[in-house]
């Protein structure tokens, strides 16, 4: 049996799939079964009581995780003039306009998030079909189309996570690294859940948060006790 398969089976044996875990115990369990040689990302999947096929039940937004993501986020900004300088001063990795559009058209994607000033969206629109499928298209709903580029860059660098409900009514998002202390992962996860609650569509009826699952990149997943998670929200 390959080493990876053996480690996965050993990790799987440590998780009780038939129960729901209190938040802190669940986080500690996920940390304990992260077996990869690299620092695995801890990810959450939240199943919501919405039907995203209806426009009035779409859930989308962004949240700055209090403890970041544990990785260097490469930020690209489409801006000119004073806003170009503001973006550079805030720590943006790449700043430009038509020159960046040309690079992207040639297949360059060495960045993790893209921000644009509103006046640049006509230019950015030319590469919408390239950015959109990769989740990189600037969008005012998540704060990446803005004249306040300095703040947007700093938030992205600090660990801003964008979320969007998928067809099955599930939101997937990272909440940190397996090397994080359990308390830091807890704070990040609660910040995400709180943002999801605030983003609840008025058209959503019945139970909104139906299931919360937690896992690391390679490790097995487990279900969290929703009532315990909600009791810890501010």
UniProtKB/Swiss-Prot annotation:
Biological process annotations from GO: regulation of translation; translation
Family annotation (PROSITE patterns): RIBOSOMAL_L1 (PS01199)
Subunit and interaction comment: Part of the 50S ribosomal subunit.
Keywords of the record: Repressor, Ribonucleoprotein, Ribosomal protein, RNA-binding, rRNA-binding, Translation regulation, tRNA-binding
SUPFAM superfamilies: Ribosomal protein L1
Identification of the protein by name: Large ribosomal subunit protein uL1
Matches recorded under PANTHER family: 54S RIBOSOMAL PROTEIN L1, MITOCHONDRIAL (PTHR36427), LARGE RIBOSOMAL SUBUNIT PROTEIN UL1M (PTHR36427:SF3)
GO terms for cellular component: cytosolic large ribosomal subunit
Family from the record: Belongs to the universal ribosomal protein uL1 family.
Function summary: Binds directly to 23S rRNA. The L1 stalk is quite mobile in the ribosome, and is involved in E site tRNA release. Protein L1 is also a translational repressor protein, it controls the translation of the L11 operon by binding to its mRNA.
Record keyword Ion transport present: no
CDD domains attached to this UniProt entry: Ribosomal_L1 (cd00403)
InterPro entries assigned: Ribosom_uL1_bac-type, Ribosomal_uL1, Ribosomal_uL1-like, Ribosomal_uL1/biogenesis, Ribosomal_uL1_3-a/b-sand, Ribosomal_uL1_CS
Gene Ontology terms, MF aspect: rRNA binding; structural constituent of ribosome; tRNA binding
NCBIfam families according to UniProt: rplA_bact
Lineage summary: Bacteria, Pseudomonadati, Thermodesulfobacteriota, Desulfuromonadia, Geobacterales
